[in-house]
């Protein structure tokens, strides 16, 4: 499977197999079953993964949408047919985060169907009549009124070159869906804000249809003031810090949780309410926060370092180290507009000299050929 990796390189003759390795954003796993790649996660004694709690975030996104429906029950059903219809932009059918978010939405809205490996996360194509086997019609009760909920359409947003999570494909999809489904579309849902904003800008804002995404990208957070329904912050500020902090600690040979669970000399430390560590999976997970009209002003700058870990390390005790870091899909909106800018701010604070390599989201050779 394709994964985003960051490898640290020191001067000297340390073999690559012994250098610290931190996977981030995309957890090494089987793209079909979602099973973790334990071999990749145990490459050596200084190998870790940094991401976010995908299931907790998926549940939050689903709950956010269900709560919105209940709060706007008098206006949400645009054509008054008693069916709350939604369309869903799926980022990557083989990506664990995409799978979790699709499942979270379907679970919260009652449209989920259980399969042999849990809730079915496959796209339905079009499902105007409710006959698709991948989902079922759900129900939501609001003050004595029962609404049916139907997934009218969903597809993986993969472009002709094979890149997934593609905003352009999502924009084309919403145009096609709007043409065939019209005012039966009451809600637009996306696995991320990149696709969500593409659909919001091309159709749903003009038509007053609430759109929900994921990632709390700056443009999506700002768009909440203009009718974007909401998004989920995966605490990218915490993730980016963890990604580089683990490398810093491994390179320095100090306790791996220095500046994480325990304060470093500069006072950097994370509290347990923003992350946790799963030892069996060798994975650090940031916790998610729902961003809605009630709190979006607190999230307007998605590239601001997290306050409790924004203290500069002393260069005399933490001298400059060199790191090779690749981003598997540099065209991805979240990775390019939020994650990398955060990394670039933390690399200065942590005295790391980083060589950033952007991949095309399709072939590993696009990155490894530049090693």
What spans do the regions from the language model cover?
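Extracytoplasmic "Venus flytrap"
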Residues: 1, 90-99, 187-193, 321-349, ...
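Beta-alpha junction/loop-to-helix N-cap segments that form part of ligand/metal-binding clefts
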Residues: 1-40, 48-52, 193-200, 360-371
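Hydrophobic alpha-helical
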Residues: 1-21, 105, 125-222, 343
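Short beta-strand elements at the ligand-binding edges of bilobed clamshell
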Residues: 33-67, 88-92, 226-241, 356-358
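Hydrophobic alpha-helical segments within soluble ligand-binding/sensing domains
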Residues: 48-81, 100, 167-171, 216-220, ...
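Extracytoplasmic ligand-binding site segments that recognize negatively charged/polar headgroups
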Residues: 53-62, 80-167, 326-338
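Hinge/cleft segment of the Venus flytrap/periplasmic-binding protein
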Residues: 83-84, 89-90, 97, 109, ...
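Exported/periplasmic ABC-transporter solute-binding proteins
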Residues: 183-190, 201-273, 285
């Amino acid at each position: 499977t394709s994964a985003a990796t960051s490898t640290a390189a020191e001067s000297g003759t340390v073999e690559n197999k012994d250098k610290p390795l931190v996977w981030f954003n995309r957890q090494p796993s089987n793209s079909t079953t979602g099973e973790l790649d334990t071999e990749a996660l145990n490459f050596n004694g200084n190998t870790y993964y940094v991401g976010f709690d995908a299931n907790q975030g998926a549940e939050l996104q689903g709950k956010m949408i269900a709560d919105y429906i209940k709060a706007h029950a008098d206006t949400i059903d645009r054509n008054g047919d008693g069916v709350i219809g939604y369309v869903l932009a799926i980022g990557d059918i083989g990506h664990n985060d995409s799978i979790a978010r699709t499942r979270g939405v379907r679970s919260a809205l009652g449209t989920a169907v259980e399969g042999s490996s849990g809730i079915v996360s496959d796209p339905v194509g079009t499902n105007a009549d409710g006959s698709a086997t991948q989902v079922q019609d759900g129900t939501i009760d609001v003050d004595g009124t029962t609404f049916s909920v139907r997934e009218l359409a969903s597809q993986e947003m993969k472009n002709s070159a094979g890149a997934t999570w593609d905003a352009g494909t999502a924009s084309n999809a919403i145009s096609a869906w709007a043409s065939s489904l019209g005012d039966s579309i009451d809600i637009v849902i996306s696995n991320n804000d990149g696709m969500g904003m593409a659909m919001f800008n091309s159709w749903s804002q003009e038509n007053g249809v609430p759109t929900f995404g994921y990632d709390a990208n700056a443009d999506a957070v700002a768009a909440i003031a203009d009718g974007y329904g909401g998004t989920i912050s995966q605490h990218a500020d915490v993730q980016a810090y963890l990604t580089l902090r683990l490398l810093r600690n491994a390179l320095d040979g100090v306790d791996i949780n220095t500046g994480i669970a325990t304060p470093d000399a500069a006072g950097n430390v994370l509290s347990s309410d923003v992350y946790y560590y799963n030892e069996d999976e060798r994975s650090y997970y940031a916790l998610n926060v729902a961003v809605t009209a009630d709190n979006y002003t607190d999230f307007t700058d998605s590239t601001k370092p997290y306050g409790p870990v924004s203290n500069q390390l002393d260069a005399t005790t933490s001298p400059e180290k060199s790191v090779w870091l690749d981003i598997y899909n540099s065209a991805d909106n979240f990775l390019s507009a939020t994650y990398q800018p955060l990394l670039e701010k933390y690399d200065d604070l942590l005295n790391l000299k980083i060589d950033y390599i952007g991949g095309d989201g399709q072939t590993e050779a696009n990155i490894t050929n530049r090693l």
